[in-house]
């Protein structure tokens, strides 16, 4: 399989001198095309910092990040903006939908910004909405949708441009268990049916158990990783065992 993401010896230090705090201490990892990978770790482990560096929201102190063979750490200005727009998709805990646009318009905006042919926009929006189970919400504004529908709309917006890599930061964090389950089910299907490559930060073992691989961070470094071999229930138990080693707590259970 083609390597979509390569992170090599990534370090991120905040502050200087005696006030310096190391958030990442030389993290190296890779993600292949079509993988669904989770990142877990206790508070302060560096998982959000890692995702932000890959997302080009934060700039690492040193190290290399390559997405689809493109080195990100040297990108600036228009080149960086274009890369984010065309090669990355983002799903955050806060949906960040535009209140004055319908669901259709929110999703279509991602394509319009990339200057996709106008004839393709409607069909691609409707296809992605159908895959995420929000085809009946396309004419609704965000305030007319449930939290789960809003988050699936945000996921459709992230996926509709067919990015190399989708970055998800606690996408189920603000959802109830039913809405979270629906979102995860749809993300799994997109991963399996379309080969979407997803890197997801989560604190929740149930959410992480939908991934095919989970990387655990502690104190800014990789502690261990697990690959899913059996069913989701078995993988969930394995994740819980590692979380217990890290001294964390698991809120959701199967």
Give, region by region, the residue ranges found by the protein language model.
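Conserved beta-strand-loop-alpha-helix hinge in the C-terminal portion
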Residues: 221-245
């Amino acid at each position: 399989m083609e390597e979509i993401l390569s992170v090599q010896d990534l370090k991120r230090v905040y502050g200087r001198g005696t006030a310096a705090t190391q958030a990442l201490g030389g993290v190296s990892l890779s993600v292949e095309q079509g993988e669904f990978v989770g990142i877990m770790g206790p508070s302060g482990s560096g998982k959000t910092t890692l995702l932000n560096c890959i997302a080009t929201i934060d700039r690492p102190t040193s190290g290399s990040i390559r997405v689809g063979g493109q080195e990100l750490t040297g990108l600036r200005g228009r080149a960086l903006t274009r890369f984010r727009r065309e090669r990355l998709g983002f799903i955050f805990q806060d949906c960040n939908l535009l209140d004055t646009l319908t669901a259709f318009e929110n999703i279509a905006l991602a394509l319009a910004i990339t200057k996709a042919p106008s004839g393709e926009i409607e069909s691609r929006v409707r296809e992605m909405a159908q895959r995420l189970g929000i085809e009946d919400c396309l004419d609704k504004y965000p305030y007319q949708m449930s939290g789960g529908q809003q988050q699936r709309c945000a996921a459709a917006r992230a996926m509709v441009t067919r990015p190399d890599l989708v970055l998800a930061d606690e996408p189920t964090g603000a959802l109830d268990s039913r809405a979270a389950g629906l979102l995860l089910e749809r993300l799994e299907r997109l991963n399996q049916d379309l080969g979407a490559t997803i890197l997801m930060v989560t604190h929740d073992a149930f959410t992480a158990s939908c991934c095919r691989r989970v990387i655990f961070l502690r104190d800014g470094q990789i502690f261990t990783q697990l690959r899913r071999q059996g069913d989701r229930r078995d993988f969930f138990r394995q994740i819980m065992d590692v979380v217990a080693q890290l001294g964390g707590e698991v809120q959701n259970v199967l």
